């Protein structure tokens, strides 16, 4: 919801700002991670909702990027970039140099298989902000984030994962 302009417009009368809320949640997350073992890899997935192939919010990462990407004590981010609701890759400029980014470029909401070359071009665009050796590829979210799951067959889900693997091998070797 932090990225959703409509959500924040609806909260205009509240006495809280996006910046205050983002800073509060960042502090809470970092406090929760304070005593984690040093060798534990901790990541954050920024989700826009994933219920039966629908979504709950939209908007690019720009509103939260300066808070989250530069300051959260995690090793990597799993970010949704499967459609126009996710915005562009420009907010990746805020990701600190010690973190990795997993690009969720393959949607888990639709059975339609993405075009490999389109995904590879999008990876190249993201690499303008994060070096390729710190980028990874995955589906945008889980295939069954809730009991009912998304509107894909098991075969279609495996095809999406095979596509991710094929692209990763071609891009990263």
Where do the protein language model's features map onto the residues?
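Domain-level signal for soluble alpha/beta catalytic cores
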Residues: 1-173
């Amino acid at each position: 919801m932090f990225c959703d302009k409509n959500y924040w417009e609806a909260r205009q009368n509240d006495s809280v700002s996006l910046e205050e809320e983002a800073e509060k949640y960042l502090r809470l997350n970092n406090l929760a991670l304070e005593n984690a073992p040093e060798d534990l890899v901790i990541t954050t997935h920024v989700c826009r909702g994933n219920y039966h192939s629908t979504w709950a919010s939209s908007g690019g990462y720009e509103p939260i990027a300066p808070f989250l990407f530069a300051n959260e004590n995690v090793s990597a981010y799993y970010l949704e970039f499967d459609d126009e609701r996710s915005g562009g890759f420009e907010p990746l400029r805020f990701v600190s140099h010690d973190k990795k980014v997993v690009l969720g470029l393959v949607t888990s909401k639709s059975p339609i298989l993405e075009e490999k070359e389109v995904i590879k071009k999008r990876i190249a665009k993201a690499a303008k902000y994060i070096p390729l050796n710190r980028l990874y590829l995955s589906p945008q979210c889980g295939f069954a984030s809730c009991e009912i799951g998304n509107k894909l067959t098991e075969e279609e889900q495996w095809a999406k994962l095979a596509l991710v693997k094929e692209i990763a091998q071609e891009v990263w070797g």
